[in-house]
Amino acid sequence: MNLILLCSQILLLLFTVANCDGEHQLDSSMDLKSDSTKSAVLKNVAPKNDATQAEIAKDDVALKSGKKGDYVMEIDVSDIPLDDYPINNSKSRKNSSTLPSQILTDKPNQGSNQIALKALKHRLLMEQNNNLFLRNHSVSLMNEIEARKTDIIQARQLNIDLELELEALKRELSEMNAQNARKSTKSCKKRPSKDIASPVNQLQEVIVKNTYRNKYLTLLTQLAQKINYEIANVNNPATDVPTGKSPSEGNPSTT
């Protein structure tokens, strides 16, 4: 944008310098032409005669001596020396015929130059207004962009804050779930090492008890058999005893 404004200012400066140079050249050419025409006219003017000078002097004296409003000057056309005027001279006729043509040819060019100058000035003003409008529009757009940037930054910061709050809430929720799980489950009592080995000892104890019980039962059965045998021997004593020993002593079951 600054480059466009700089280019427009440079073009304006060049345009004004060119216009000044053109106007200066046009004025100088017009001055030269007017000086040449004036010199040509002065050269072609013929000097006045002595008779005409004397008549002019008489008229001046009469005007001075007379009162205002009383003197009326009568001029005869035949008294005027027509040869003294440049319009009646051949050279002056040529110059008079050429002079208006040059002036007429210069005036349209000058008018066209002025029209072109006005058009260029109008176009330059339009370009300046357009550049000013574009600059203001660009400034407004930049301000809007900056405002949008600030809005985006604020929205991102708000999103970050919301994400942090969400993470904190998730952490608290997980802690609450863990606490609820701990409360819902009962803790198991710890057993000592003796309690861990008790089932084996109990099994061994049962086995020992069974073995001793079996042995006890066998002994009881043997004792009952012996008692019954002794009772039977007491009721029926033996007649032939080879030795002096009692029958109970010779019984192998007593051993």
From Swiss-Prot:
Residues 183-192 have a biased composition (Basic residues). Main cells of the accessory glands of males. Keywords: Behavior, Glycoprotein, Secreted, Signal. Pfam families: MAGSP. GO terms for biological process: mating; positive regulation of octopamine signaling pathway; positive regulation of ovulation. Residues 86-110, 177-196, 235-255 are annotated as: Disordered. GO terms for cellular component: extracellular region. Residues 1-18 form the signal peptide. This protein is transferred from male to female's hemolymph during mating, affecting egglaying and behavior after mating. This is Accessory gland-specific peptide 26Aa. It comes from Drosophila sechellia. The lineage of its organism: Eukaryota, Metazoa, Ecdysozoa, Arthropoda, Hexapoda. The gene is Acp26Aa.
